[in-house]
Amino acid sequence: MTNEFHHVTVLLHETVDMLDIKPDGIYVDATLGGAGHSSYLLSQLSEKGHLYCFDQDQKAIDNAQVRLKDYIDKGMVTFIKDNFRNLKSNLEALGVSEIDGILYDLGVSSPQLDERERGFSYKQDAKLDMRMNEEASLTAYDVVNTYPYNDLVRIFFKYGEDKFSKQIARKIEQARQVKPIETTTELAEIIKSAKPAKELKKKGHPAKQIFQAIRIEVNDELGAADESIQEALDLLAVNGRISVITFHSLEDRLTKQLFKEASTADVPKGLPFIPEDLQPKVALVNRKPILPSQEELEANNRSHSAKLRVAKKIRK
């Protein structure tokens, strides 16, 4: 692994083991990141098996090409530089119409957070950016400096769930009338200035939720996850599985809802039986999310909010 792309994988064994790996199966890592999940999954495949890895960050792919070199040399890995919302079209272009399993590790990766110039973190001073795909056009700077007040309030409430969204949006509006808000530190200070003193004494950084909201907006994270997970459920072969790790309530609610819809028969109540073509195509493998062990929590602080949900395809 390259030094500049160090990433501690969360729920490593649980996420992959719950896929019930077939040695000669076809699998997808929808969120390559530091390639931790990919490396462990590939170790369980025979040379007849194959793993397709998605990431829109070229640095993640460059790192993985070094880390997974032995498997690449055996022809067991294909990298796809694209947003995972384009899952189905990319796989179909490669002749793949069915998969045995897929995993998602949603949210921003540690290297993206830690690389100052990517502009994700309120802990390091950098230009406002937050793009997971550095070739994308919309940046955090654009959101903060061009979105109307009402749109800022909407995304802060919807994606940040911050009860001071209106006050923060108003402060941003006032500040950018004087000069553009250009850096993460500037934005963090504006957010802090909008919150009452007693709120600033609470645990956690006062800018955390707003930075999350802007990042989700810049990358359309929830829209992409919604589209991709639905496509993944469709692509799964019978007995194929999907593992999804989430790190905040918005991602977890979305995943839970998609799994619930796919695992529930869409028929009126009171029918004496459910016709086979209306039976659910998916079953939940775990009704409650799997959480990190105490050992993992102590070893990796970033795992504390992680939740893993798993579902299984039961019919086409």
Curated annotation (Swiss-Prot):
Enzyme Commission number: 2.1.1.199
Swiss-Prot/TrEMBL catalytic activity: cytidine(1402) in 16S rRNA + S-adenosyl-L-methionine = N(4)-methylcytidine(1402) in 16S rRNA + S-adenosyl-L-homocysteine + H(+)
Cross-referenced InterPro entries: RsmH (IPR002903), SAM-dep_MeTrfase_MraW_recog (IPR023397), SAM-dependent_MTases_sf (IPR029063)
One Gene Ontology biological process: rRNA base methylation
Coiled-coil regions listed in the entry: none
GO terms for cellular component: cytoplasm
Keyword hit for Methyltransferase: yes
Domain of life according to the entry: Bacteria
Pfam families assigned to the protein according to its UniProt record, in alphabetical order: Methyltransf_5
Subcellular location: Cytoplasm
Principal localisation: cytoplasm
Keywords, comma-separated and alphabetical: Cytoplasm, Methyltransferase, rRNA processing, S-adenosyl-L-methionine, Transferase
Binding site for S-adenosyl-L-methionine: A35, G36, H37, D55, F84, D105, Q112
GO MF annotation, one: rRNA (cytosine-N4-)-methyltransferase activity
Function: Specifically methylates the N4 position of cytidine in position 1402 (C1402) of 16S rRNA.
Annotated family: Belongs to the methyltransferase superfamily. RsmH family.
Protein name per Swiss-Prot or TrEMBL: Ribosomal RNA small subunit methyltransferase H
Gene responsible for this protein: rsmH
